[in-house]
Amino acid sequence: MIKLFNTLSKRVEVFKPIDDVVKIYCCGVTVYDLCHLGHARSYIAWDVLRRFLIYSDFKVKYVQNFTDIDDKILKRAKEESSSMKEVSEKNIIEFHKDMDSLGIMRPDSMPRATNHICNICSFITILEDKGYAYSRDGDVYYSVFKNKNYGKLSNQNIQEQNINKQGRMANEENNKKQNPQDFALWKKAKNDEPFFDSPWGRGRPGWHIECSAMVKDELGDTIDIHLGGSDLIFPHHENEIAQSEAANGKKLANYWLHNGMVNVNGQKMSKSLKNFKTIRELIKSGISPMTLRYFVMTVNYRKPLDFTEEALRSAAEAWKNINLALSFMDLTKGAFRSIDKNESIEEEYKEKLSFELSQKKLKFSEALGNDLNTAGAIAIIYDLAKPLKNFLNQFQRIEGLKIDLNEKFFLLENFKTLEKLTEVLGLKKEVLVKERKITEEEISSLINERLKAKKGKNYAKADEIRNLLKEKGIELIDQSKEITTWIRV
């Protein structure tokens, strides 16, 4: 059973798909710049949802759009002395690079607004014919007061909104709109802007109508799940509902899911506030893509995610341990490839282990099924990784280590389960570069050098050696003044 918090009903609901294929639409990026951590947070959350639905034997059709015509794109094109198309094409390529690096599955379809102009115009015409839209001098607006259900997603009071907006609008806009709260479906082209031909003259679509038209064209009138950031609830998603349900006479989406924002010093991370870190910058600074992915999943998708250096360091340490366990087969040099046919495991032990692992899988599914509790799912991952990591520390230090047959079977089955469940979270093994940069002889030599430094009261040198080894994945354990052991972390 999968339960999800539905923004529309304001409660957690059992997920019930419309038919055999779960239809999901996710609001995509406006392609004028590189993606930041806030984008990563959103698309990682929805990637986990998609992977978990597939793991739970659902068929999924996942659509995510590109907004490739917008004021921000036009502004960037002007700044770069290029065209709207050049700016969007360049940033679509960069978007894919970033998402691929984070292990985010590519959507089944990624429609672009500029490829749906005919559908958008048809959609607006339907709204006009039904009395929900009106044109003024080349602009077309949606009449909010014609829709009695407007505000049902965001709980906005349209009467109060209307009073508050009165007087804040330019006279020209006031003269065109029937009510200040009405929003643009089609915008008349300015002299220096790209344009598309339409029944209302040259212009371009409004932001909200793009998604309504693409949802209908790609997935139909009613979909299972609509996704986006909490900053899109109003006005974007509220306006989508108003447009689509007025035009189609049907519910737009059964479930509305929204992720929380990434905060920096208590403020939302955003390009407008100039307090953002791009995914590219973070990775270039030495943070691995899977560390970023792990970091995002440590907090439930609906809650704010506080971006701090300390939290990132903690995520890096935690991911390093899981990654070590995922590298189990590589680091054991083939010793665990299989159980020999002549080796027999007691059936009673097999059944016991099978039951224990099935319980862990069940708890994993229960965690993700409880409104995508990724932190709970990670706890199960840690439980599976721990014995593998502990064994690796012994295996790498003790030459000719003898392995009990039951232990071998236990570790192999644990590893297989770990691999399967980390795939559901989209966590993939990263190359252990540091593990290959230092030998056991070098470790012993540095430990001896450190002991000499400590005896000579050169504690700065001793700390320098400890930190050097830690950077290479070696944690020192001082058992006494004379004895220091180590483990790989």
From Swiss-Prot:
ATP binds at residue 271. Its cofactor is Zn(2+). One of its GO terms (molecular function) is cysteine-tRNA ligase activity. Zn(2+) binds at residues 27, 211, 236, 240. Keywords: Aminoacyl-tRNA synthetase, ATP-binding, Cytoplasm, Ligase, Metal-binding, Nucleotide-binding, Protein biosynthesis, Zinc. It is found in: Cytoplasm. Pfam families: DALR_2, tRNA-synt_1e. Its EC number is 6.1.1.16. It comes from the Bacteria. Its main location: cytoplasm. GO terms for cellular component: cytosol. InterPro entries: Cys-tRNA-ligase (IPR015803), Cys-tRNA-synt_Ia_DALR (IPR015273), Cys-tRNA/MSH_ligase (IPR024909), Rossmann-like_a/b/a_fold (IPR014729), tRNA-synt_1_cat_dom (IPR032678), tRNAsynth_Ia_anticodon-bd (IPR009080). Binds 1 zinc ion per subunit. A motif ('KMSKS' region) lies at residues 268-272. The keyword Zinc applies. NCBIfam families: cysS. PANTHER family: CYSTEINE--TRNA LIGASE, CYTOPLASMIC, CYSTEINYL-TRNA SYNTHETASE. Monomer. Belongs to the class-I aminoacyl-tRNA synthetase family. This is Cysteine--tRNA ligase. It comes from Prochlorococcus marinus (strain MIT 9312). The lineage of its organism: Bacteria, Bacillati, Cyanobacteriota, Cyanophyceae, Synechococcales. The gene is cysS.
